[in-house]
């Protein structure tokens, strides 16, 4: 029992120093605050999913991508995908493309 309390105190101290110790708790200034933030964020997404149903929620995500594809046209959407596919945790797709000499035609990104 004491070890669990000590662990919570350690996590709380890290949270007070600005570290995220609970997934989804980004921005919380204490362990408890991060727990509440994470719970609220999770519940927010789930509430929307419950309102729309699983199919509707999936369709909403699909529609967002389709709308963007229609705005940019097929070529622009594919070009953006190429750039996004090059990104890593420490470098953006644009940085990697530049380093590796891969041409990305950003003029195709323009909304029609």
From Swiss-Prot:
Induction context: Down-regulated by drought in 30 days after fertilization seeds. Not regulated by drought in leaves, cotyledons, hypocotyls and roots.
Gene Ontology terms: biological process: response to abscisic acid
Matching InterPro entries: LEA_5, Sm_Hydphi_plant_seed_CS, Small_hydrophilic_seed_prot
Biased composition (Polar residues): 44-53
Segment forming the signal sequence: none
One Pfam family per UniProt: LEA_5
Ranges annotated as spanning the membrane: none
Sequence ranges of Basic and acidic residues compositional bias: 7-17, 32-42, 56-82
Start and end residues of each stretch annotated as Disordered: 1-112
Tissue specificity as recorded in UniProt: In seeds, expressed in the embryonic axis and in the cotyledons. Not detected in leaves, stems or roots.
Family: Belongs to the small hydrophilic plant seed protein family.
Protein name stated in the entry: Protein SLE1
């Amino acid at each position: 029992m004491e070890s669990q309390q000590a662990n919570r105190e350690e996590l709380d101290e890290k949270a007070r120093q600005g570290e995220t110790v609970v997934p989804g708790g980004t921005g919380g200034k204490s362990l408890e605050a991060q727990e509440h933030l994470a719970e609220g964020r999770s519940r927010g997404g789930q509430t929307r999913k419950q309102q729309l149903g699983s199919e509707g929620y999936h369709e909403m995500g699909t529609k967002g991508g389709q709308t963007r594809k229609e705005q940019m046209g097929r070529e622009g959407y594919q070009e953006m995908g190429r750039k996004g596919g090059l990104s890593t945790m420490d470098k953006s797709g644009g940085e990697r493309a530049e380093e590796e000499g891969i041409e990305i035609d950003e003029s195709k990104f323009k909304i029609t």
